[in-house]
């Protein structure tokens, strides 16, 4: 069997901004492998990297998500949206799989703004966007919140989290006596953006060799180096099983308790949740696309055929969908 060439993996220091935004180079690769590896790693980065996210909220005096709170400027839906955006640094030694953790807040200070930094956290936990505004109060002691978080992967909508809350409600502890547990969407993906490029190396070899460069931007909850390492381990775990021709058995790659269902949970997600530009949103709306599930059924060519969608809008929609673990069929890579 022909030996493979020695591959080098390095960080591109010239493009490094910090631990959470940097670029990596893999070279030399045989012709075609740069795109093959880049596509696989990119998709795993966007869909399967572990992180921590809220899944349930309890607010003092709030029985459902459509209420208003006395002496609080924001209504409950606005507060829930902001709580969902709390970003917590992921450390598997602190946030164990299958366990539930609580963030608590009590506005015992005078009237004013309340931020993510005002939450009491589990020991060792850190909020990476402490300046996130949660609410503005007109008096002291009017807002008390418990936010329940867990480790996971991908995207879980509030309907699935409702079912999960019903299953584990007896394990949720809260000092808030009057109020209901409210489910929120969980976006576990710690990746903000990932892209790759492939190019031929200028060598004297008669064999064409390629360079793969991957640019990764995370949300600050995990550093880029650990993210790409985790993606590679996931791919290797799958490929090792496929390569074991003597044991053609079905095996679970991910440990029990950290596994989210692979099928997409997009039936209840409206396109408003994609946070698209007005031009892209209106084009989809005029074409009668209202949910992410409808877009999931499209190919990239179908998307290109929608009236008033230019290349920039198409790229925006594709990028937003991938954050929900939805990948449009692009044909042959």
UniProtKB/Swiss-Prot annotation:
This is DNA-directed RNA polymerase subunit alpha. Residues 263-333 are annotated as: Alpha C-terminal domain (alpha-CTD). Homodimer. The RNAP catalytic core consists of 2 alpha, 1 beta, 1 beta' and 1 omega subunit. When a sigma factor is associated with the core the holoenzyme is formed, which can initiate transcription. It is an enzyme of class 2 (transferase). One of its GO terms (molecular function) is DNA binding. Keywords: DNA-directed RNA polymerase, Nucleotidyltransferase, Transcription, Transferase. One of its GO terms (cellular component) is DNA-directed RNA polymerase complex. DNA-dependent RNA polymerase catalyzes the transcription of DNA into RNA using the four ribonucleoside triphosphates as substrates.
């Amino acid at each position: 069997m022909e030996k493979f060439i020695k591959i080098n993996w390095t960080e591109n220091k010239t493009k490094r901004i910090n631990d959470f935004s940097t670029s990596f180079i893999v070279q030399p690769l045989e012709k075609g492998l740069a795109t093959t590896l880049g596509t696989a790693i990119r998709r795993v980065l966007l869909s399967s990297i572990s992180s921590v996210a809220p899944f349930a909220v309890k607010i003092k005096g709030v029985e459902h998500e459509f209420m208003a709170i006395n002496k609080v400027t924001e209504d409950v839906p606005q507060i829930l949206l902001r709580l969902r955006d709390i970003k917590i640094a992921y450390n598997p030694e602190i946030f164990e799989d299958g366990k539930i953790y609580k963030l608590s807040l009590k506005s015992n200070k005078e009237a004013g703004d309340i931020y993510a930094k005002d939450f009491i956290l589990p020991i060792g936990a850190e909020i990476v966007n402490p300046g996130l505004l949660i609410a503005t109060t007109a008096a002291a002691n009017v807002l008390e919140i418990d936010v329940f978080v867990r480790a996971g992967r991908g995207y879980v909508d509030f309907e699935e989290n409702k079912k999960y809350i019903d299953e584990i409600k007896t394990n949720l502890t809260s000092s808030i006596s009057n109020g209901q547990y409210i489910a929120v969407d969980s976006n576990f993906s710690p990746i903000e953006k990932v892209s790759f490029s492939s190019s031929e190396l200028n060598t004297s070899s008669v064999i064409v060799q390629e360079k793969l460069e991957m640019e990764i931007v995370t949300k600050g909850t995990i550093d880029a180096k650990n993210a790409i390492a985790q993606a590679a381990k996931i791919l290797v775990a799958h490929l090792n099983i496929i390569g074991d021709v003597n044991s053609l058995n079905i095996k679970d790659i991910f440990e029990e308790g950290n596994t989210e269902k692979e099928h997409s949970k997009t039936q209840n997600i409206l396109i408003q949740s994609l946070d698209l530009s007005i031009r892209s949103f209106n084009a989809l709306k005029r074409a009668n696309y209202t949910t992410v599930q409808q877009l999931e059924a499209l190919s990239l060519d179908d998307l290109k055929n929608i009236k008033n969608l230019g290349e920039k809008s198409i790229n925006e929609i594709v990028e937003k969908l991938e954050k929900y673990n939805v990948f449009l069929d692009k044909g042959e890579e």
